[in-house]
Amino acid sequence: MSLVPATNYIYTPLNQLKGGTIVNVYGVVKFFKPPYLSKGTDYCSVVTIVDQTNVKLTCLLFSGNYEALPIIYKNGDIVRFHRLKIQVYKKETQGITSSGFASLTFEGTLGAPIIPRTSSKYFNFTTEDHKMVEALRVWASTHMSPSWTLLKLCDVQPMQYFDLTCQLLGKAEVDGASFLLKVWDGTRTPFPSWRVLIQDLVLEGDLSHIHRLQNLTIDILVYDNHVHVARSLKVGSFLRIYSLHTKLQSMNSENQTMLSLEFHLHGGTSYGRGIRVLPESNSDVDQLKKDLESANLTANQHSDVICQSEPDDSFPSSGSVSLYEVERCQQLSATILTDHQYLERTPLCAILKQKAPQQYRIRAKLRSYKPRRLFQSVKLHCPKCHLLQEVPHEGDLDIIFQDGATKTPDVKLQNTSLYDSKIWTTKNQKGRKVAVHFVKNNGILPLSNECLLLIEGGTLSEICKLSNKFNSVIPVRSGHEDLELLDLSAPFLIQGTIHHYGCKQCSSLRSIQNLNSLVDKTSWIPSSVAEALGIVPLQYVFVMTFTLDDGTGVLEAYLMDSDKFFQIPASEVLMDDDLQKSVDMIMDMFCPPGIKIDAYPWLECFIKSYNVTNGTDNQICYQIFDTTVAEDVI
């Protein structure tokens, strides 16, 4: 690597990013996934960064060359991205690679040497860059908590996810879907570590050295997409393994039951799961070498337990999850947590004994759910008064619009500075008059795909046809001095197949002329229209009851979510058969018909407890939050 002649680059703060631009940025790594092979031929890495503006940016980086992606070893590292393309996806700003994308990575520790990590032979690094790295280090030292997921073996506990810095002593192929790594970090686990039977396997490594270190060595099974990475590792190399999972397993011998601590790197890339080789120059490797040199090799560990890596599944005769069920090592959760991933799990039996309010992380299976007819789960929810109501049926809407169509439009309210008006007289319907008012943009009629219509006297079928041709439609009627909303029992805004409703209790309706404040906008955002008209908009939500079972207890939890849990908008599912099928498939996967519950997938969830008072009766209820369906399930 060598420096190139200095070029003056401009770096954009993360709070000033705009979609469609190509920028240069600096940031501190808050989350990352080590490079992994995508479904195509490229490698992919996901990196979330933050800077002094406290704005986060998630970047999806692709390259045909593994080494061309950022060389990140842990959260807190500092990155510099050149020629990063900014786009907006699902209302979230994100960065993606563009032509000529390049990156540098620096250790984020205060006082550490500022040495760029990059696979590029040539790069630009000036005194200004040096100052920016130092400034980010200082800021991060007071604004970001150090990652406590990086643990030593002596500190790990069962049912934990953590990152491990270690040295590879040996490796062996187990089968096509799993691979064995023997590693150490100079410390001993607090529980006996398991041993994978390898009598028929070829173990690569110094067997005498491994035997000498057996009291300090652990066996890790890695699965699925991580196998090809594990296979390429060199014995003796220093590794960081991300999101390693520990489980305490009971094994029955002749006269006693023994416990052993298992280590698994599950398939997939959730929570940054993966393996990275660390260079000898890395400061964490320096510390690891010191730990290895001072390790007490003669210390006696608890008796190691030898166990098979893949016991057969067994199903209990009862319809509840077996407390001692042997979970298959590769089995991943069908749901994932969107925050607080490293909180300890709590068994349901303990939750049921505690007072509310509390928050818990659980792992359970779905025994049953309501309603079984999933389209019935979509409701309308007011975020202000928390009222829940049914989504109006088409037949009810048709009656509301037919009733509105009996009133004749007032000629005095037509053709104003806000809109141009056109009147149609229907045939064979007693000369029913329909008024359509085309809202202008600064006095000019916009194109149909940008145009808002106000319609008087239209039927449901007529309004639906217009909503497919124009940007938005608002059903109105003639008032004494101005046009008014038809009725909050009907949608206040229709966009394509989406009907937007308002809360009758919380809304204080304003004149249609208040839309003047929005006429210079190029799109009609439902929340902006609602605000202009004094409407508190209702949200489409899925409302369901899940009966959860973890083998220690059974608990009913309430799900109320607009789009995060299923990653499918509740506002669209009623009008889209394909989306309805997707939700049906997800629920059939959670709760498969015709098989016993032990074969159901695990669900990883956050739930919160709260008190509900009904007269003199007090009840504790539970609600699911910060949980979403895993990407590989959708």
From Swiss-Prot:
Disulfide bonds: none annotated. Ubiquitous. Changing R137H: In TPDS3; increased telomere intensity signals and telomere fragility. Keywords: Chromosome, Disease variant, DNA-binding, Nucleus, Telomere. GO terms for cellular component: chromosome, telomeric region; nuclear telomere cap complex; nucleoplasm; shelterin complex. InterPro entries: NA-bd_OB-fold (IPR012340), POT1 (IPR028389), POT1_C_insert (IPR048953), POT1PC (IPR032042), Telomer_end-bd_POT1/Cdc13 (IPR011564). Changing Y89C: In TPDS3; complete abolition of POT1-DNA complex formation, thus disrupting the interaction with telomeres and leading to elongated telomeres. The keyword DNA-binding applies. Signal peptide: none annotated. Residues 33-48, 270-273 are annotated as: DNA-binding. The keyword DNA damage does not apply. SMART domains: Telo_bind. Pfam families: POT1, POT1_C_insert, POT1PC. It is found in: Nucleus; Chromosome, Telomere. The record marks S243 as: DNA-binding. GO terms for biological process: establishment of protein localization to telomere; negative regulation of telomere maintenance via telomerase; positive regulation of DNA strand elongation; positive regulation of telomere maintenance; positive regulation of telomere maintenance via telomerase; positive regulation of telomeric D-loop disassembly; regulation of double-strand break repair via nonhomologous end joining; regulation of telomere maintenance via telomerase. GO terms for molecular function: 8-hydroxy-2'-deoxyguanosine DNA binding; DEAD/H-box RNA helicase binding; G-rich single-stranded DNA binding; G-rich strand telomeric DNA binding; single-stranded telomeric DNA binding; telomerase inhibitor activity; telomeric D-loop binding; telomeric DNA binding. Component of the telomerase ribonucleoprotein (RNP) complex that is essential for the replication of chromosome termini. Is a component of the double-stranded telomeric DNA-binding TRF1 complex which is involved in the regulation of telomere length by cis-inhibition of telomerase. Also acts as a single-stranded telomeric DNA-binding protein and thus may act as a downstream effector of the TRF1 complex and may transduce information about telomere maintenance and/or length to the telomere terminus. It is linked to Tumor predisposition syndrome 3: An autosomal dominant disorder characterized by an increased risk for the development of various types of benign and malignant neoplasms throughout life, with age-dependent penetrance. Affected individuals can develop neoplasms involving epithelial, mesenchymal, and neuronal tissues, as well as lymphoid and myeloid cancers. The disorder is associated with elongated telomeres. Cerebroretinal microangiopathy with calcifications and cysts 3: An autosomal recessive disorder characterized by intrauterine growth retardation, retinal exudates, global developmental delay, neurologic regression, intracranial calcifications, and leukoencephalopathy. Homodimer or homooligomer. Component of the shelterin complex (telosome) composed of TERF1, TERF2, TINF2, TERF2IP, ACD and POT1. Binds single-stranded telomeric DNA as a monomer. Associated component of the telomerase holoenzyme complex. Found in a complex with TERF1, TINF2 and TNKS1. Interacts with TNKS1. Forms heterodimers with ACD. Identified in a complex with ACD and single-stranded telomeric DNA. Belongs to the telombin family. This is Protection of telomeres protein 1. It comes from Homo sapiens. The lineage of its organism: Eukaryota, Metazoa, Chordata, Craniata, Vertebrata.
